[in-house]
């Protein structure tokens, strides 16, 4: 860049040299002669100086004044108006950079001064705390030293001096009390001003009780002989200290709070959110993001709830739903010597086959002679003594209680006596009894009754029961057949001997020294005594005063009665008793357990009551024909259980044969119960226990059965055409099989030429040889009848027009998605996948 002198610059700006030198000197430049060189930065400095001197900085004013004028009109009655003008004026001053810098420096100095003051304050507080600590230690040391000296002095003085030392402190309080009594006499009279002044000064002072409750803060003692009551007297700092002591505050958590979430087998979304201390909507939103749309009351399984809780950053503790039951089972200790117990026998049979007569004869013959004749049976269970031991009988008419016990898993019966009339043969109710006994897995002793009648035919009984898989011992089976006569008493001893022989084979054991455990046979609500339950003690000993847990009920045994209505104090194994004191009537088949205390009994009972509704709802869907696939999906071979009732024997046998023949290696039909006649309450109980469907062929259900079906949600169907039953069962089995995927070939096109398209790549010019070619369907490319590619038909055109389908004998252009290796001579096969239901 060329050098410019002061003289040349004066010529450029058309200014005399002397004036330019004067202006440059005012601008602070060192130039004094016309020959000196002027640099660009010096030119800029001169220009800035000239602008300032000529007033150009006024374009950036340092002070701005704003004026605002507002005019409003007010009405003053009638047509008169008053104009009100409001003027506002504001001035804004722009500070220079030097002022801003000075302000910032002042703020920094003030901040440093404040920090220094805080530091000094903290040091003073620390020094004060150290002084307090040292003073406290010195005081404790002095107190300990004084105590030691006092102990040493007391030990050295004789007993007389000790008496004087004791008497002196006693005398001092007496003198003090005397002075206190005299002081009120010397108190001068107070006027109202004194009282008002005292109230003003003492209204905020804490009382003695308040001072005892709130301990005074530790401070360095001012003087050793000055007593302090913890209240600051005088000074302006007392009020602020009181406020500071009563201050409350909340600190935000510095990090996420991790909670321990207890998750059972099932948990609702609301319960899960409550355990994590978050809103239920947050959990619902989180599960929506996971791809699981749920509601706030929806029940989650354990795995899903565990995943949600862990994703939200909480610890998970898996809890067993039956934890209380497991703890209860562990607390029950059945320790002691096991002894042989009496068998529990249930007598079953058809109504007219002499079951009641046989029971009456056994009771008359085996109960003590002094009690015979006027016996009143209070409960449906009793025990008799024989020469070979004791036998306990359960009277379960209609088999309702027996089926209910089996449904709840309570094996209350050891042996079943099946009473069959020799002159009548095997009847429908006899078949039901056999089905119940086999389902419970207990041995059967057959009593062929009415053997004294001329028309008796025992061989017919054996043939009929052999058809039900009850094989006599003479034929190589395991069921003893005993001919008896309930009228004459013939064969009763042999029957009891056969029962006791079966009991010896079963090796029934019990521990009398253990806490009582049993099962409920029946229960009722007595008007004068409240809930009364008939309990069969199976193990241990039940005593009066024991706390018992029975199903969802509990209570203390206030009284126990035997089968004759006499009060007893305790009952051993295989003894039936009536107990009083429960808080409700338990169901037949509920398990009775003696627990240690009432707290544990109440806790388990409430837990069972909570689960009762869930179990009932789950069981309501168990027997639905439509839900068979979900209910039995875990089994290797799916089974459809059926309880079948028909009007005549021929129809029943035909249906049983046809239904049993259905099925294959994956599914099967099992007729768990069948008979001739209407659907009874016993059939409904059997279907409930066996998870079966009730079928009635030309028969209907009675009131008791309908009540159970409605209460438990069983599936019951009526038919009058035999083929309808077979067709419905086939459909159910087909639904259990699932479905298959089948491929149908829609059409085949042969590639005649290949074109190139910038959009689709290789386009095959084809002739449809078979069927019909559809767009957006899966295809296969075959070369020499070998599949070389499988994909989707992307483009289908005919004469440059997109078409949905092309029939056989027509030409078309085909674009295959993501495939460009099409050659002349290839075949394109278009197919579809169809879901086909499997059939038997």
Swiss-Prot record:
It comes from Pseudomonas aeruginosa (strain ATCC 15692 / DSM 22644 / CIP 104116 / JCM 14847 / LMG 12228 / 1C / PRS 101 / PAO1). This is Translation initiation factor IF-2. Residues 395-398 are annotated as: G3. One of the essential components for the initiation of protein synthesis. Protects formylmethionyl-tRNA from spontaneous hydrolysis and promotes its binding to the 30S ribosomal subunits. Also involved in the hydrolysis of GTP during the formation of the 70S ribosomal complex. One of its GO terms (cellular component) is cytosol. Residues 374-378 are annotated as: G2. Residues 340-509 form the tr-type G domain. Residues 95-155, 173-256 are annotated as: Disordered. Residues 485-487 are annotated as: G5. Residues 449-452 are annotated as: G4. GO terms for molecular function: GTP binding; GTPase activity; translation initiation factor activity.
């Amino acid at each position: 860049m060329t050098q410019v002198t002061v003289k040349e610059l004066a010529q450029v700006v058309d200014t005399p040299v002397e004036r330019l030198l004067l202006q440059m000197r005012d601008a602070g430049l060192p130039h004094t002669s016309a020959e000196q060189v002027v640099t660009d930065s010096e030119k800029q400095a001169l220009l800035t100086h000239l602008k300032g001197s000529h007033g150009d900085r006024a374009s950036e004013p340092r002070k701005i004044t704003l004026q605002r004028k507002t005019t409003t009109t007010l009405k003053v009655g009638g047509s008169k108006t008053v104009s009100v003008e409001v003027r506002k004026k504001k001035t804004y001053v722009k500070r220079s950079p030097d002022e801003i810098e000075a302000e910032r420096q002042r703020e920094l100095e003030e901040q440093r001064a404040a920090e220094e003051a805080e530091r000094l304050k903290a040091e003073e507080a620390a020094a004060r705390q150290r002084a307090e600590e040292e003073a406290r230690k010195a005081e404790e040391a002095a107190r300990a030293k004084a105590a030691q000296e006092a102990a040493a002095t007391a030990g050295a003085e004789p007993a007389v001096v000790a008496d004087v030392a004791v008497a002196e402190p006693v005398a001092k309080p007496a003198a003090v009390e005397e002075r206190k009594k005299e002081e009120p006499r010397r108190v001068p009279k107070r006027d109202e001003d004194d009282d008002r002044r005292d109230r003003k000064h003492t209204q905020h002072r804490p009382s003695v009780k308040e001072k005892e409750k709130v301990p005074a803060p530790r401070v360095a003692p001012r003087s050793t002989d000055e007593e302090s009551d913890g209240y600051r007297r005088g000074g302006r700092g007392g009020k602020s200290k009181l406020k500071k002591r009563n201050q409350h505050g909340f600190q935000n958590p510095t990090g996420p709070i991790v909670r321990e979430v207890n998750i059972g087998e099932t948990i609702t979304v609301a319960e899960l959110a409550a355990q994590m201390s978050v809103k239920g909507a947050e959990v619902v939103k989180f599960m929506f993001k996971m791809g699981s749309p749920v509601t706030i009351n929806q029940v989650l399984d354990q795995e899903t709830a565990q995943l949600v809780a862990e994703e939200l950053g909480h610890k998970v503790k898996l809890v067993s739903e039956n934890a209380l039951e497991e703890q209860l089972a562990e607390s029950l200790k059945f320790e002691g010597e096991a002894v042989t117990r009496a068998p529990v026998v249930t007598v079953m049979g058809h109504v007219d086959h002499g079951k009641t007569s046989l029971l009456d004869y056994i009771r008359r013959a085996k109960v003590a002679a002094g009690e015979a004749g006027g016996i009143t049976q209070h409960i449906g269970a009793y025990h008799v003594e024989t020469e070979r031991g004791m036998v306990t009988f359960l009277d379960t008419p209609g088999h309702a209680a027996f089926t209910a016990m089996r449904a709840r898993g309570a094996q209350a019966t050891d042996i079943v006596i099946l009473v069959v009339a020799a002159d009548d043969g095997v009847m429908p109710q006899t078949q039901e009894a056999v089905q119940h006994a086999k389902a419970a897995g207990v041995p059967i002793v057959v009593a062929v009754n009415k053997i004294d009648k001329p028309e008796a035919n025992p061989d017919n009984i054996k043939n009929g029961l052999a058809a039900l898989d009850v094989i006599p011992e003479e034929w190589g089976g395991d069921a003893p057949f005993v001919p008896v006569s309930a009228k004459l008493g013939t064969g009763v001893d042999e029957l009891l001997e056969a029962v006791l022989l079966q009991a010896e084979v079963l090796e029934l054991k019990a521990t009398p020294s253990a806490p009582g455990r049993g099962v409920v046979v029946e229960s009722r609500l007595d008007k004068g005594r409240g809930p009364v339950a008939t309990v069969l003690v199976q193990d241990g000993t039940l005593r009066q005063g024991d706390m018992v847990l029975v199903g969802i009920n509990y209570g203390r045994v206030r009284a126990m009665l035997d089968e004759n209505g006499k009060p007893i104090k305790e009952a051993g194994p295989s003894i039936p008793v009536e107990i009083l004191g429960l808080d409700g009537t338990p169901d037949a088949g509920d398990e009775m357990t003696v627990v240690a205390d009432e707290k544990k009994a109440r806790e388990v009972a409430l837990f069972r009551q909570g689960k009762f509704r869930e179990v009932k709802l789950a069981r309501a869907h168990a027997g639905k024909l439509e839900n068979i696939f979900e209910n039995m999906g875990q089994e290797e071979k799916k089974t459809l259980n059926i309880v079948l009732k028909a009007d005549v024997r021929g129809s029943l046998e035909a249906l049983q044969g046809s239904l049993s023949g259905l099925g294959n290696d994956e599914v099967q039909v099992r007729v768990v119960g069948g008979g001739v006649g209407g659907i009874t309450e016993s059939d409904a109980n059997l279907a409930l226990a066996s998870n079966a469907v009730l079928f009635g062929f030309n028969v209907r259900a009675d009131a008791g059965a309908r009540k159970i079906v409605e209460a438990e949600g069983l599936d019951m169907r009526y038919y009058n055409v035999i083929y309808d039953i077979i067709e419905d069962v086939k459909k159910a089995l087909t639904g259990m099989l699932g479905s298959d995927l089948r491929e149908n070939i829609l059409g085949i096109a042969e590639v005649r030429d290949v074109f190139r398209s910038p959009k689709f790549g290789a386009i095959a010019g084809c002739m449809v040889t078979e069927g019909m070619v559809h767009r957006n369907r899966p295809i296969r490319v075959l070369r020499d009848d070998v599949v070389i590619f499988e994909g989707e038909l992307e483009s289908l055109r005919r004469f440059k027009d997109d078409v949905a389908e092309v029939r056989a004998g027509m030409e078309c252009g085909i674009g295959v998605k993501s495939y460009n290796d099409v050659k002349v001579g290839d075949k394109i096969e278009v197919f579809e996948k169809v879901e086909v239901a499997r059939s038997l």
